Amino acid sequence: MRLPVLSPTALRDEQKLLYEDMRKGIKSHFGGFESVRSDGALLGPWNPWLHEPKFGKPIWELVKTIVANPSLASPVREVAILVTGAHFRSAYELYAHVLIAEQRRLSDEKLSTIIAGQRPTDLTGPEGVVYYFASALVNGGVLPELTYRAAVKEFGANGTAELSYLVGLYCMVSITLNTFDVPVPD
């Protein structure tokens, strides 16, 4: 870990406001994995964002926007997030979202295959579209036209845009976690 975990009692004023908002959001949207220490300190990507509130606050606003009233089903979202986390080999990201995906009833076989960077054979139609979409984006270049059309057909224009922003956000989350070598909790 390259940054010390910030204790809530040691936060500057600008960090305190962000901390309180993050705590509230974590409680309502990010359960099922360890994201807050017993002393209230935030783990995962939230700690680096607290260190730099001028960057952390707008990133957190994007997170809140993307998790508020999503149009995409939870299992589909988790496939996109796991494809992204696996691409970046982001340990904390994979730890957290494997636990979430298990709660959303994605099979162990499906999860382990995605984490290995491969396409599971038992993906549903929507999951398959998302797998190809997220894989193409994280591997760089323009999203292939047929992949884009398949997403629009499956999720509509707004759902496709949401999927793009979701993958982009989790690229940023994964890079943040990797930059600061954020570990999986003990």
Where do the model's predicted regions map?
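Acidic/histidine-rich alpha-helical segments that form the ligand environment
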Residues: 124-164
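Short amphipathic alpha-helical segments and their helix-coil junctions
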Residues: 56-70, 113-116, 144-153
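N-terminal hydrophobic signal/anchor transmembrane helix of membrane proteins
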Residues: 3-6, 22-23, 56-60, 79-96, ...
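Secretory/endomembrane lumenal or extracellular ectodomains immediately following the signal peptide
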Residues: 1-74
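A short structural micro-motif
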Residues: 66, 86-87, 117-121, 154-157, ...
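Histidine/lysine/aspartate-rich catalytic loop segments that bind and position anionic ligands
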Residues: 98-124
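C-terminal end-helix/capping segment
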Residues: 101-109, 176-186
